Regions:
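Acidic, metal-coordinating helix/loop segments flanking the phosphotransfer/catalytic sites
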Residues: 13, 26, 38-58
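Charged docking surfaces used in two-component/phosphorelay signaling
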Residues: 23-31
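Acidic catalytic/metal-coordinating carboxylates
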Residues: 41-44, 68-73
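Alpha4 helix (beta4-alpha4-beta5 surface) of REC/receiver domains from two-component response regulators
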Residues: 72, 76-79, 83-111, 117-124
Length: 139
């Protein structure tokens, strides 16, 4: 069922360790016209980015993953791509937004579960907002 929203042309790096969620998110975004590069964890994402030669516009990553989590992945990616837009997703919203936050101030978090419409709308909002390199300064 196609969503009636503005179609995307950007490239998104999707990093999610749960195959069913990765497949769902990838399909929704591809149906909206985005180019989607998929990775199963942070280490896999770094390999994908190293091999991809075109511009990358957004990293959409799970927060908690084995090997290399979302925040550490984002820090590494922003070191080489400081204008990359970032969108986190997590089923652990209370933990991720707690007093001793796992995420940096101002980070956009999409809480699981989400609908296709919520996904597409949030992705578009993050892509349309100016990217920030503030994440590089987070200890």
């Amino acid at each position: 069922m196609p969503l009636e929203m503005s179609r995307g042309r950007e490239t998104i790096l999707l990093v999610e360790d749960e195959p069913d969620i990765r497949d769902f998110v990838g399909e929704v975004l591809q149906d909206q016209g985005y180019t989607v590069l998929e990775a199963r964890d942070g280490e896999d994402a770094l390999r994908v980015v190293e091999q991809y030669r075109e511009p990358l516009h957004l990293v959409l990553t799970d927060v908690a993953m084995p090997k290399l989590g979302g925040r550490d992945l984002v820090a590494r990616l922003l070191a080489q791509h400081p204008h990359l837009n970032v969108l986190y997703m997590s089923g652990y919203t209370d933990d991720a937004l707690g007093a001793r936050s796992v995420l940096e101030a101002g980070a956009t978090l999409l809480a699981k579960p989400f609908t296709p419409r919520q996904l597409v709308s949030t992705v578009r909002q993050v892509l349309d907002a100016p990217a920030s390199d503030e994440l590089l300064r987070v200890p």
